[in-house]
């Protein structure tokens, strides 16, 4: 019986940077350090940082005057930044640089008075933050589209001054049909730059696709509120492989392993390798004697910390 590890898997550069920002701030300024929203969507990471002195809040009114606050990797609306400035809070922005690039695109279109369609999941903090970048004072409007049906129904004012952007945790494949629908309806719609698309999301999904045909079970390490982790599980299932999302090895059920001989393992972009190795050890203890690494795209991207934390 064999365990095959997908590559790449686990932490991306944006998550690494966000965690480093919180830990560095704790080292330099001491606890408590306030973090608006979970810095990344992983229960283990959040609890670890909480134990080190991070205090997670959902809104800035929970942060005392004079405190240090960190914005999560998902990004925040302009109004949140403005409130922090008004209150004189010391702020460190852990927004993923790839999310920031999308924010800049939205701002550029807004200043031109162009309408923008955001392809993403309603209620996800990244989507809330990106929608909150759009300045309507220039006469434009921004819309959220989640499905092909939304794209077929959406009504906009000027199809010749229109652009779309996407939530970074959605891959090219995730958005393909929606974008095609928008292009058919609005031939002059402007697309986002190719390098604005999150490399990590695409690479992790491609790794699952390449590995799925070799497995009769797939385990994805990640938290239930992690968008990209859920998508990895869905991809394996669509390819006909039984798949489960687990926060840790303790959530693996014995019945899942019955009759299985080749188990694929991957991790969402916010799940640490420590949890993957615990899953591997659990599988070893259940008779999976061989562990191999599946070939995949090598990632060497590193995002720098804010100057004040270097």
UniProtKB/Swiss-Prot annotation:
It comes from the Bacteria. Isopentenyl diphosphate binds at residues 41, 74, 124, 226-228, 270. One of its GO terms (biological process) is terpenoid biosynthetic process. GO terms for molecular function: 4 iron, 4 sulfur cluster binding; 4-hydroxy-3-methylbut-2-enyl diphosphate reductase activity; metal ion binding. Keywords: 4Fe-4S, Iron, Iron-sulfur, Isoprene biosynthesis, Metal-binding, Oxidoreductase. The keyword Acetylation does not apply. CDD domains: lytB_ispH. Dimethylallyl diphosphate binds at residues 41, 74, 124, 226-228, 270. Its EC number is 1.17.7.4. It catalyses: isopentenyl diphosphate + 2 oxidized [2Fe-2S]-[ferredoxin] + H2O = (2E)-4-hydroxy-3-methylbut-2-enyl diphosphate + 2 reduced [2Fe-2S]-[ferredoxin] + 2 H(+); dimethylallyl diphosphate + 2 oxidized [2Fe-2S]-[ferredoxin] + H2O = (2E)-4-hydroxy-3-methylbut-2-enyl diphosphate + 2 reduced [2Fe-2S]-[ferredoxin] + 2 H(+). Pathway: Isoprenoid biosynthesis; dimethylallyl diphosphate biosynthesis; dimethylallyl diphosphate from (2E)-4-hydroxy-3-methylbutenyl diphosphate: step 1/1; Isoprenoid biosynthesis; isopentenyl diphosphate biosynthesis via DXP pathway; isopentenyl diphosphate from 1-deoxy-D-xylulose 5-phosphate: step 6/6. (2E)-4-hydroxy-3-methylbut-2-enyl diphosphate binds at residues 41, 74, 124, 168, 226-228, 270. [4Fe-4S] cluster binds at residues 12, 96, 198. Binds 1 [4Fe-4S] cluster per subunit. InterPro entries: LytB/IspH. Belongs to the IspH family. PANTHER family: 4-HYDROXY-3-METHYLBUT-2-ENYL DIPHOSPHATE REDUCTASE. Catalyzes the conversion of 1-hydroxy-2-methyl-2-(E)-butenyl 4-diphosphate (HMBPP) into a mixture of isopentenyl diphosphate (IPP) and dimethylallyl diphosphate (DMAPP). Acts in the terminal step of the DOXP/MEP pathway for isoprenoid precursor biosynthesis. HAMAP family: IspH. This is 4-hydroxy-3-methylbut-2-enyl diphosphate reductase. It comes from Thioalkalivibrio sulfidiphilus (strain HL-EbGR7). The gene is ispH.
